[in-house]
């Protein structure tokens, strides 16, 4: 066993002595040591219940004849961090999580790992670590929260609250109505109830094969999630016995399948960023052109909030992720069904008995929302290395208009609230990319303000930053190269005409190459917003969004 490094042989007497101080007995040294990587944090509703999850996981691991050791990671609640400097720490927290998990697991030579994530950057951070460490691993997420209901019976979620702010600002609802939405938008523990980033990543974790069937859709408060925990411990023991590791599971084909599900469900645009980072950790050469190829062959079968009024509880009721995959498998060339997963079985075996139970929620191949996926990769002279739009969250497929330029999210939100944006405008928020932000903050507050003011179909928004999974409308993010790297978005001037063509996958500014070259020569890189601390180091090391915004290792040659 891998853990023999710290527990076997006469020279490991000091190690065993320390381990006995934690409560271990001599007989425990013949059992696998299992890292229980938890993320219990009281301020994050998606993680507040995970201390109890950790106890259940440890009980299940002991029952399977193994020895559990629990530790915790940090985490950031993107909703609470939204709209202030806290959002700059969100994406960078992914790297801290990955590094901290790597540190604990490799320092103590564990034989296997069970990860208990749930929310936005915590799930991908743990997944990155699992691929980096590459020991047998199973994920059991905390699960989604249920949607809420206002006193009038209206179904609401977190995006409803954000949009309610814009609606109140524009006089569409009263302060009492906003308070009603606030009080009911997040009714319980769990990840926010729509197809936002947390649920998108937990669903992708399931189809990648690192989590068990049901992981993406079973609610946090559903007793079936406890059954998942028991299964996870049993499956981990099988993975250890068969030496099946994350890099055996997360192959190029598995990532294709993850993006196929993403396209079928119209997941968060953040999945592109995180899954490219996973590919990097797995040592795979995977880029945005391959994502675009997946988008072209996968129909959009399922619209979940914010693209519709359906929520994760509805997906679960309709058959869950397995039912969506089973329907997708009917189309040749969409899924790779014979690859291994954390169950110890193939994807084909995992979904064999699944079926759609509500075709209003999960559409059939014969009745898709669209013939192509719910995410699109756009390119053009404004995004030479690519940009991402959640095409399934807008009915507008082509938009052309003049730029209204803001050099930060704060500046943009103030401008929107002051009425500086009107119907037909293209809002540009720049210098918010991985380096420029730094930290590539999400633009949920501006998109929600636009939607709440009733301009969601009449105003486009472009940024080198990110969007929350709760964002909707004509929102194009991840524009690469970013402004801080001298990308075209940095060269735009007030009133320039921008064209967004979703069907043709184009993002263009209507000016000549000669004019762009002239502006590039005149452009001067702004001073970094942050020069010290973690964000200062992050800005120096982070790569572009089109490569997953991972940290580059300095060249010591």
Curated annotation (Swiss-Prot):
Binds 1 [2Fe-2S] cluster per subunit. This cluster acts as a Lewis acid cofactor. Pathway: Amino-acid biosynthesis; L-isoleucine biosynthesis; L-isoleucine from 2-oxobutanoate: step 3/4; Amino-acid biosynthesis; L-valine biosynthesis; L-valine from pyruvate: step 3/4. It comes from the Bacteria. Its EC number is 4.2.1.9. Keywords: 2Fe-2S, Amino-acid biosynthesis, Branched-chain amino acid biosynthesis, Iron, Iron-sulfur, Lyase, Magnesium, Metal-binding. Its cofactor is [2Fe-2S] cluster; Mg(2+). The modification N6-carboxylysine is found at residue 121. [2Fe-2S] cluster binds at residues 119, 192. Mg(2+) binds at residues 78, 120-121, 442. Gene3D superfamilies: IlvD/EDD C-terminal domain-like. The active site is at 468 (proton acceptor). The keyword Zinc-finger does not apply. The keyword Lyase applies. Belongs to the IlvD/Edd family. Homodimer. Functions in the biosynthesis of branched-chain amino acids. Catalyzes the dehydration of (2R,3R)-2,3-dihydroxy-3-methylpentanoate (2,3-dihydroxy-3-methylvalerate) into 2-oxo-3-methylpentanoate (2-oxo-3-methylvalerate) and of (2R)-2,3-dihydroxy-3-methylbutanoate (2,3-dihydroxyisovalerate) into 2-oxo-3-methylbutanoate (2-oxoisovalerate), the penultimate precursor to L-isoleucine and L-valine, respectively. This is Dihydroxy-acid dehydratase. It comes from Bacillus cereus (strain Q1). The gene is ilvD.
């Amino acid at each position: 066993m891998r853990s023999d490094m710290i527990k076997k042989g006469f020279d490991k007497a000091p190690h065993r002595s320390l381990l006995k101080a934690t409560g271990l007995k001599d007989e425990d040294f013949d059992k696998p040591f299992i890292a229980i990587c938890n993320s219990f944090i009281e301020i994050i509703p998606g993680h507040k219940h995970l201390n109890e999850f950790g106890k259940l996981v440890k009980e299940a691991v002991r029952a399977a004849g193994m020895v559990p050791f629990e530790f915790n990671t940090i985490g950031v609640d993107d909703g609470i961090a939204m709209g202030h400097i806290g959002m700059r720490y969100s994406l960078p927290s992914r790297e801290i999580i990955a590094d901290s998990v790597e540190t604990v697991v490799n320092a103590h030579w564990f034989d296997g790992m069970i990860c208990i994530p749930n929310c936005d950057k915590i799930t991908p951070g743990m997944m990155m670590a699992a691929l980096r460490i590459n020991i047998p691993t199973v994920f059991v997420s905390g699960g989604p929260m249920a949607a809420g209901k206002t006193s009038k019976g209206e179904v609401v979620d977190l995006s409803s609250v954000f949009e309610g702010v814009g609606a109140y600002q524009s006089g569409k609802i009263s302060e009492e109505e906003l308070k009603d939405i606030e009080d009911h938008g997040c009714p319980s523990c769990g990840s926010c109830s729509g197809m936002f980033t947390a649920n998108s990543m937990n669903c992708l974790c399931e189809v990648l094969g690192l989590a068990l069937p049901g992981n993406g859709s079973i609610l946090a408060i559903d007793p079936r999630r406890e059954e998942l925990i028991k299964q996870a411990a049993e499956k981990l023991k099988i993975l250890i016995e068969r030496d099946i590791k994350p890099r055996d599971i997360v192959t190029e084909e598995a990532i294709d399948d993850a993006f196929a599900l993403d396209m079928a469900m119209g997941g968060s645009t953040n999945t592109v960023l995180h899954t490219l980072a996973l590919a990097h950790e797995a040592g795979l050469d995977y880029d945005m052109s391959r994502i675009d190829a997946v988008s072209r062959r996968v129909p959009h079968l399922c619209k979940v909030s914010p693209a519709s009024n359906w929520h994760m509880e509805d997906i679960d009721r309709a058959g869950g992720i397995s039912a969506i995959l089973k329907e997708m498998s009917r189309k040749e060339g969409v899924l790779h069904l014979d690859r291994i997963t954390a169950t110890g079985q193939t994807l084909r075996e995992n979904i064999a008995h699944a079926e759609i139970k509500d075709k209003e929620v999960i559409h059939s191949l014969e009745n898709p929302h669209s013939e192509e996926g719910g995410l699109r990769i756009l390119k053009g002279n404004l995004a030479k290395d690519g940009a991402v739009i959640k095409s399934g969250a807008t009915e507008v497929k082509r938009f052309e208009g003049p730029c209204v330029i803001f050099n930060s999210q704060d500046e943009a939100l103030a401008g929107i609230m002051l009425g500086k944006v009107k119907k037909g405008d293209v809002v540009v928020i720049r210098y918010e990319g991985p380096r420029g932000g730094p930290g590539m903050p999400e633009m949920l507050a501006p998109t929600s303000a636009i939607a709440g003011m009733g301009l969601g179909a009449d105003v486009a928004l472009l940024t080198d930053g990110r969007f929350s999974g709760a964002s909707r409308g004509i929102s194009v993010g991840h524009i690469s190269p970013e402004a801080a790297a001298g990308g075209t978005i940095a060269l735009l001037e007030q009133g320039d005409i921008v064209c967004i063509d979703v069907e043709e996958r184009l993002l263009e500014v209507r000016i000549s190459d000669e004019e762009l070259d002239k502006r590039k020569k005149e452009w001067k890189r702004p001073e970094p917003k942050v020069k010290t601390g973690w964000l200062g180091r992050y800005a120096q090391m982070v790569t572009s969004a089109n490569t997953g915004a991972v940290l580059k290792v300095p060249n010591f040659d």
